[in-house]
Swiss-Prot record:
It is a peripheral membrane protein. GO terms for cellular component: plasma membrane; proton-transporting ATP synthase complex. It comes from Levilactobacillus brevis (strain ATCC 367 / BCRC 12310 / CIP 105137 / JCM 1170 / LMG 11437 / NCIMB 947 / NCTC 947). It is found in: Cell membrane. SUPFAM superfamilies: ATP synthase (F1-ATPase), gamma subunit. Produces ATP from ADP in the presence of a proton gradient across the membrane. The gamma chain is believed to be important in regulating ATPase activity and the flow of protons through the CF(0) complex. InterPro entries: ATP_synth_F1_ATPase_gsu, ATP_synth_F1_gsu. The lineage of its organism: Bacteria, Bacillati, Bacillota, Bacilli, Lactobacillales. This is ATP synthase gamma chain. One of its GO terms (molecular function) is ATP binding. One of its GO terms (biological process) is proton motive force-driven plasma membrane ATP synthesis. It comes from the Bacteria. Belongs to the ATPase gamma chain family.
Amino acid sequence: MAESIHDVQRRINSTKATRQITSAMHMVSTAKLNKIQKQAVGYQDYVSKVKAVVMHLSQSHLLDNSSSSLQSNRPVKKTAYLVITSDRGMVGSYNSSVLRDTNAFIKERTPNPDDYMVLAVGGTGADFYKHRGVNVAYEYRGVSDVPEFNEVREIVKTVTTMFNNEVFDELFVCYNHFVNRISSRFRAEKMLPVDKETMSTDAAKDTQAAPLTAEYDTEPSEEEVLQVVLPQYAESLVYGAILDAKTAEHASSTNAMQSATDNADDLIATLQLHYNRARQAAITTEITEITGGQEALNN
């Protein structure tokens, strides 16, 4: 049965209201994306310096003699995966993408569910793994849209404490890396234990420093220097991953809201065409009835 003019008009009004919402959300997401991109650029200056120091340390004898708990290379009995997702929906394929790729990464490395646990940053990931019976040993919800460095300290403190207490023996950070405003790429980076090879490889990704063999004179002592540098390195990895993931999240949300707005425009145009045709048909019917009535009177 064909829709009445009033039904079509009601759908047009409803779609226009939805379009106003998606358009407003698109503008909000764009503003958040612009803000976090500026913060990410500023953070890169800091993290590049930290990783440069780390790279030089990895080429010296300091790490070889370190007794830092973060470098504990014990046999791996349990692996932890720090999975970064959003707390809410309406972010396009962002969450489904990172969870799909994380599951593939976990299945490849630790196919036995008893051999791993999940540390979830973001409610979507926490709920996803809980509903599937996965051991979610830690969850952190409510990360700011533009996260500050202090937010990460709580996460890093909890994670490193769990590592030191041998709750798990190695940790990977899994998230979506922001490539540009229309695409992101899955990343899984080893965070703990902090070993010489991992530090050197990670630092080399972000610095242009030439390889060198460095000897350091440290004050007040080698151990005290490393007790400061290694936690800063761990914090930089987690904060950088969260900042990167949030940037990808806002980009995905911006694209999703733009797509929803465009779809609403297309639907409104289609409904308007149906409305015009229905109205024209109603007018034609009314004219026909008037003409028929006039002819009946004349006869």
